[in-house]
């Protein structure tokens, strides 16, 4: 899912945020959002979308709480940044964040 999304990333993406959602029935979704701006002091940068996988989110079925799910996805992304096929594409961005859409964003990478 992630590699397919990164293959299609437009050149005008300045930063990426991974929006997390709690769905029904122990399901959790994540979407990749490419943005036209980045400001580590103002999380509204994640609202300036120029690319999104909203119509094709990654869905995980797991009985867990939101914090554990956020940690799970964060760990996955940090590992991907180290050795993923398109890690270089992610690292070209000025910043990468992750967080639930109704919560705070955490920066996991900054150029």
Regions found by a protein language model. Name each.
Residues 1:
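A Trp-anchored, charged/polar loop motif used as the substrate-binding/catalytic surface
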Residues 4-9, 39-42, 49, 53-111:
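Acidic, proline/glycine-rich low-complexity IDRs
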Residues 4-42:
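Amphipathic, interaction-prone secondary-structure segments
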């Amino acid at each position: 899912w992630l590699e397919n999304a990164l293959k299609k990333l437009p050149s005008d993406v300045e930063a990426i945020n991974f929006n997390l959602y709690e769905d029904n029935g122990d399901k959790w979704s994540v979407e990749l959002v490419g943005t036209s701006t980045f400001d580590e002091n103002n999380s509204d940068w994640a609202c300036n979308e120029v690319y999104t996988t909203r119509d094709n989110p990654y869905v995980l079925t797991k009985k867990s709480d939101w914090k554990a799910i956020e940690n799970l996805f964060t760990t996955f992304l940090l590992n991907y940044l180290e050795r993923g096929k398109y890690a270089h594409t992610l690292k070209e961005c000025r910043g990468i964040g992750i967080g639930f859409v109704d919560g705070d964003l955490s920066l996991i990478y900054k150029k």
